[in-house]
């Protein structure tokens, strides 16, 4: 029998605030175990949580970017469970009255556009970590992560393949990094995924028992885990069995999923409103103030670049991968007025230098002002593209350098004086009579050879386009 997978994802997105969600302890990653904790994180009697306003603002910004409804009276709930890395015995989370309600994103899968609906995005605190590799006979507990702010983004079960799930996950990962609300570092646990997977006969609309795949920490593992789970469930149904609702772990070494525990329902967690935290009161003015901070989003920017500048998809993908790159590109285009030239030089030449020096775009030492001035000099033929690379290399090493001064001190200004170029061209044609005869005999590719010889005479300073025109005219005239 043929089956259709039904997949929903729960993405756990750590917010990059300085402090935790309900305490002033540092939320920074990588400190010595149990050094970023205080009385609130340790659940001392009598302490009270205080909401981190920046975390709330980040959640609202994210919801607006998703086209969600912002719940102005969202409620914090206690999710009760016993686990050693949660000192309180409960997690402060949200449920149906979450701050982010609804919304959707578009994804591209195998050349087709699909829509994935958002169920909700809940603002909650992260748990601590159980550490198994320090002690031989015990498990350690590190509470540095306990209380770090998270958004748990719950999708509707709108995905029907591992490829669609990964495309959705990548889309959200890109968005949170673009907005600057999370670093999305999967190795450090800043972006984690739980996948809910079920299957049903093709054509059926009934939702069957789902299996939750827990804490998958890479795009590749998400694809593998979902595909393996789809095959496992298919084998069970083909053998006449039934799939049990449970939580399973993915083992990437054995390429299999294994039972972790039976899957809990909401009632098992005994949710109730946290009595220490009043419902939120987000005014319309507050929401609009945050909306005003929303940048032009990646999809809108990509559409504009495609429509206004006719850029190709690969170049657009490079430009919108971060907000900083897109802002830089827009600033350069505003001054040099040549979008295709700017896009090419940013995505090729500037990217080359960043890669060679193992730097991110945030560490780019060349200002948009310098870069636009460089492109203006290339655009108006003051310098050749080849010498433009030399200027860029110099700017990379000298952050305060002036483009005009670099061109003059390095002697890179192009020679466009017709008389000088005609003299060199005549000398070249006189020096290569055989090649001239061959050209006139039909070997027109030799034109590039003649241009190259003039460029040598000028030490690379001649304007190659002008040289090309002059030599063509000379060859036709004679």
Swiss-Prot record:
Q: Does the keyword Transport apply?
A: no
GO terms under biological process: glutaminyl-tRNAGln biosynthesis via transamidation; translation
Which reactions appear under catalytic activity for this entry?
Answer: L-glutamyl-tRNA(Gln) + L-glutamine + ATP + H2O = L-glutaminyl-tRNA(Gln) + L-glutamate + ADP + phosphate + H(+); L-aspartyl-tRNA(Asn) + L-glutamine + ATP + H2O = L-asparaginyl-tRNA(Asn) + L-glutamate + ADP + phosphate + 2 H(+)
Has the keyword Cell membrane been applied to this entry?
Answer: no
UniProt keyword terms in alphabetical order: ATP-binding, Ligase, Nucleotide-binding, Protein biosynthesis
Q: Which Pfam families match?
A: GatB_N, GatB_Yqey
Gene3D superfamilies for the chain: 1.10.10.410, GatB domain, N-terminal subdomain
Could you name the domain of life of the organism this protein comes from? Bacteria
Which EC number(s) does the record attach to this protein?
6.3.5.-
Molecular-function annotations in GO: asparaginyl-tRNA synthase (glutamine-hydrolyzing) activity; ATP binding; glutaminyl-tRNA synthase (glutamine-hydrolyzing) activity
Top enzyme class, one word, equals: ligase
Kindly give the HAMAP family that the UniProt entry links to this protein: GatB
Q: What does this protein do?
A: Allows the formation of correctly charged Asn-tRNA(Asn) or Gln-tRNA(Gln) through the transamidation of misacylated Asp-tRNA(Asn) or Glu-tRNA(Gln) in organisms which lack either or both of asparaginyl-tRNA or glutaminyl-tRNA synthetases. The reaction takes place in the presence of glutamine and ATP through an activated phospho-Asp-tRNA(Asn) or phospho-Glu-tRNA(Gln).
Q: Which family does it belong to?
A: Belongs to the GatB/GatE family. GatB subfamily.
| Quaternary structure and interacting proteins, as annotated | Heterotrimer of A, B and C subunits.
Name used for this protein in its record = Aspartyl/glutamyl-tRNA(Asn/Gln) amidotransferase subunit B
Q: Which organism is it from?
A: Dichelobacter nodosus (strain VCS1703A)
**Which gene carries the instructions for this protein?**
gatB
